[in-house]
Structure formats: structure tokens, C-alpha cells
């Protein structure tokens, strides 16, 4: 029962009491009314208390029920929330997986697009490089065409001037011819007069008189003819000299390449001075192995952050430089590693030499050379003659010979080829017996070069015996290249020749595998074959080599001969 029901009940009871009092009449007294009212009040209070108690019970029950409902609702809500959260997590995980998958797919697509873009960029860069090279080539061709046009214009002017001179000479010849005709007529008149006088004075017959006159005229004409021939020869000699000087001047003006005198020492930078100890190795084993394998002196002194490589042979020195730089870069320096790196450097040197040969042929404008000849040509990069780099000298001779051949109307390409190959014998003259001319002739014939090239190689030092004009042109170009101030130096060449002679003497003995002239020619290290030279024979060999050097060479100070005999036993653990 609710509180409203209790209030209504009290009102009904009150009204009932009032109505009861009215029906029973007025006879009841006020005391009874009050008693009734008091009883009604007590009853009402009891009812009210009961109602309140019941209300409290109901309220408590309602609270308990509400609490239970709330707990149930909370449990259901929690379950629903957990279910919703689980569903959300599932959907979120699915969405994340889908997003991750799409991201991966997008990443793959992006990576592929990036690779395509990089490839496209590389292709564009390559195209730009090709375009740049093409522009440079076209620019060079335009410049060459411009120079060729100028040269042709100058040549046309020279030809016009020569034609004018020829016309003047022709007019002079016509005048001289008229004068000669006049002289002939005068001579005829004189002859008739002489005949008449002879007839009158000497009483000679006409035949005798004619014979005497003709003999006299023959003598006079012979003298005049000899004088004219001498004058014509002198004019031709002067004209040829002027033309030759003009051709040489044009060739020298159009060819002005640099000269480079090679040295016998190479400086190799090192990261720090602490690296010098690692290069030397324990008890000097690293430096000994390096010098024995390369034939180059490795000089370690007080020079900060640098070591020196000394050798008269530029190829050995370059191989040593490449090997040392690789060892410094790698950091592992020990005899077996040194042997491996030196062998690798030798292989790389072969490629480098071939590339230098190709570049030289391209620069000289010579095509169609065989690979073996290109390899030999590249070796000239490391060859010097009186301090002048032979490869640069050969390129210069090729250009000069080509220019002079073009001026003379000869095959400029063939002249350039002959000029480029005229010193090819110097590429192997240290390994093969014979002069560089003889070696060059043999190499040119071996590789099937034209006879003009062979003739130029054979006679570029004695053009008087040449069979073709190309040998004369090459000889002139060779003299021009070598005669320029500063192009050659005598002292360095003599020094290199002395070192080569030391090695050649050591290599001439049987059982010698290789020999190196080191310490600026103060020491010769001879590596012998251990199966042919014993320890006792090694001592005798050193004495024989020293005696031969004393007899055949002139040198300052003394030369130490060191014979090295090494025996190796190698086995592999498997």
C-alpha cells in the first residue's frame, strides 16, 4: 500500500466518523465524540504506522528489487558491452588487418612505382648523358668543320695566289717566247750576214760555212740552256722549301699537345703514420714480401702521412701503387694477402693498359686496330724516351703526319696510323731482343698492317731510304715532336737505360727467374729458380753477375747484387 492510499484511507475514516456522528444524532455528547475521535485518531495512527511500516517494507523491497534489477541491468549491460567490445575488437582487428593488407599492397605498389621511377630517372639520366655526349660530339664536329672550312679557305687563297703566280709566269713565258722568236729572227739575219762574210773572206762553201755557224750556235745554246736549267732548279728548290715550311708551320700551329716527363718515384698517401708499422710488418716481413713481388722499393721515412714507391719501371710502380692502396683500404696486410692483391693489381693493370690504348687510338683518329696491337699501344703509356711520354709522343706524331698528308693530298688516315704506330716496338723492347725499329716491323707484319705503315716504322729514323712518302712524313713529324723545347731530357733517359742494363745482365744468366734494379740502381735483386740454383751456386752467381756488371757498365759508387733463393712447400688440409 502506498502513502497516497494511506492518506485516502484516513480521510475516508475521518469522513465516516463525521457521518456516523451525524446519523446517531445529536444525542451523543462531546465526550463521546472526542473519544470516538481519539479512538479514530489512534486507529488512524496505528493504521498510519502500519502503513508506514508496510511502506518502508515495500520501499525496502522496492529498493532491493531495484538493486537487483540494477545489478541485473548492469550485468546485462556489462555483458552487452563486453559483447559489443568483443565485436568492436573483432571488427577493429579485421579492419586493421584489412588496412595492413592494403598498406602492404600500397607499399608494394609504391615500391614498384618507385623502382619504375628510379629506372625511368636512370634512363633519363642516361639519355641526358648521351644527349650531352652527342652535343659535345656535334660541337666538336662543328668546330672541326669550321677549322676545316678555314683551312680550305686558306688553301683556296693559297691556290688562287699560286694560280696568279702561274698566270704571271705564263705571261712571262709568252714574253720570253716572243723575245726568243725575235732573237731567232735576229740570229737568222746574223747567220745570213756571217755566211755572206764567210763567203767573201774565207772563200768557204755554203755547207762548210753552215757547219761552222751551227757549231758556234750549239755551244752558245748549250751554255744558255745550262744556265736556264740551273735557274729553274734553284727556283723549284726555293719554291719547294717555301711550301715545306708553310706545311710544317700549319701543322705545328694546329698541334700543340702537352708534354709530360715521368718521374721514377710515386707518393702514396696513408691514413696516419701508425700505418707505417703495419706496412713494415713483424721483422719487416711485409715490406720484404711486397718488394719481392713487385720489384719496387717501398721507402718509409719521416714524410708525414705518406710512403714512397721507387722504381724506374712505370708499370711495376703503378702495380705497386694499386696494390698498396688496396691493402691500405682493406686493412689486412700480411704476405699471403700481399701476394693476392699484387696478382689482382696485375690483372687490373692489363685492363688499364688496354683502355689507354683504345683512348690513344680514338684521340689519334685511327680505327681498325687489332686488340693485340691496342694492348701494345697502351703499354707505351708507361714508356718514356728521354723523359717524353712515348704514347703522347705517338699521338702527336699521328696528328702532325695527318695534317701534313692532308696538305699534300695524301691519305691522312693512313698517315695518322703510321704516325701512331711508328714507335710500337718500344712497348716490348725491354722484353724482346733487338732495336725498337726491328721489333716494330715484326709486330706490324704480325698484325697485318699496310706496307706503308711497315715502311714508316722501318725508316722513320732514315727517311732517305724510304719507299713511300708516309715514312718521310712520319720522320718529319717525329722530329717536330721531339725537337720542341722541354719535350725531352737526356739525364733521366741515361738513368733508366742504366737500370735496364742492370736487369738485362742479371736475366742473361741461366736459372734466373726475374731481376729487379732497386735503390736507384745501387742494388740488383735476383730471384732464382730453386730447382736449378743451389745455395752454393747462388753465391757463385752473385759473384759472376757482379763481375759482369763491373766489366760492361760505368756507374757511380758500387752496385750490390743480392741473389734470393726461396723454397716453398704448400699443402692443403681437407
UniProtKB/Swiss-Prot annotation:
Name the InterPro entries on file.
HD/PDEase_dom (IPR003607), HD_domain (IPR006674), HDIG_dom (IPR006675), KH_dom (IPR004087), KH_dom_type_1 (IPR004088), KH_dom_type_1_sf (IPR036612), Ribonuclease_Y (IPR017705), RNase_Y_N (IPR022711)
Parts of the chain that traverse the membrane: 1-21
Start and end of every KH domain? 264-327
Tell me which residues make up the HD domain.
390-483
Organism domain of life: Bacteria
Enzyme Commission code? 3.1.-.-
Does this entry carry the keyword Membrane? Answer: yes
Q: What is this protein called?
A: Ribonuclease Y
Q: Which organism is it from?
A: Thermus thermophilus (strain ATCC 27634 / DSM 579 / HB8)
